[in-house]
Amino acid sequence: MISRTRQEALDKAKTLIEALPWLSALHGKTVVVKYGGNAMTDPDLRARFAENIVFLRYAGLRPVVVHGGGPQINAHLERLGVESTFTAGLRVTTPETMEIVRMVLVGQVNREIVGLINEHGPFAVGMSGEDAHLFTAERKYAMVDGEPVDIGLVGEVVDVQPGAVRSLLDDGRIPIISSIARSAEGGVYNVNADTAAAALAVALGAAKLIVLTDVEGLYADYPVNSELISHMTASELEEMLPTLSSGMVPKMEACLRAVRGGVPQAHVLDGRIPNAMLLEIFTDEGVGTMVLPDKDPAGGDA
């Protein structure tokens, strides 16, 4: 009779063997991870996230992290007595607010992520989207009742220069990138981290885009139907977009943009689940929702 301890060891070995085809397929491939939500504020989840990213690196993948920092920005604005408002789900970013956003994302959040990862080795290197002209953005307007509304220094990424990121990856490093972008005129913009991550994934020719959220993934007809959609095509997602909640729209638009731009797979995962990334990447079952390119009539990707 096999002891409980021996059985647990055998189960672990089975899990490792199950990962073999995924390790083989993804060895040397780039994976862009958008990090945000509750996973950024819970100390245990933050530590587990750092471990997962380092695991990917040791497993032979080339992880890149793009992060936001909404909760931390809100906390600093409140502490400094600066009022923050939202229009159509987007933060109205005055020059005063932009200064705080930049300080928090680049000077606090980025450094914390770099520090957590580097507890496991000299891997992480912090960057702003401004550095080496990585992200260039143009002003974005919110749409209210079909009319464009000025929301200040909020930008949409229109150009990506990924050379510096590639150099870091080639050197075995893990780039950690804050979602700040330059303008062609020399200013700075606050950009959505989901869309920035998607743009970078396309520019790098990444094998996967992974977006961490505070929900399990995309539901078939929430709240009427809470059945999780495990996978869907780009066209199916595009058809579903108008029905989604405002919080899910930028995340799913990022997935759509990524696969339409040539990224083979985009995933939305619950960052509150410990090791969710590893479950999605290295197991047959996976977790969350995976978006795939459309198939052409010949059976290949469109």
Curated annotation (Swiss-Prot):
CDD domains in UniProt: AAK_NAGK-C
GO function term, MF aspect, one: acetylglutamate kinase activity
Keyword set, alphabetical order: Amino-acid biosynthesis, Arginine biosynthesis, ATP-binding, Cytoplasm, Kinase, Nucleotide-binding, Transferase
Enzyme Commission number(s) of this protein: 2.7.2.8
InterPro entries: AceGlu_kinase-like_sf, AcgluKinase_fam, ArgB, Asp/Glu/Uridylate_kinase, Glu/AcGlu_kinase, NAGK-C
Binding site for substrate: 69-70, 91, 190
Gene name per UniProt: argB
Name of protein: Acetylglutamate kinase
Domain of life: Bacteria
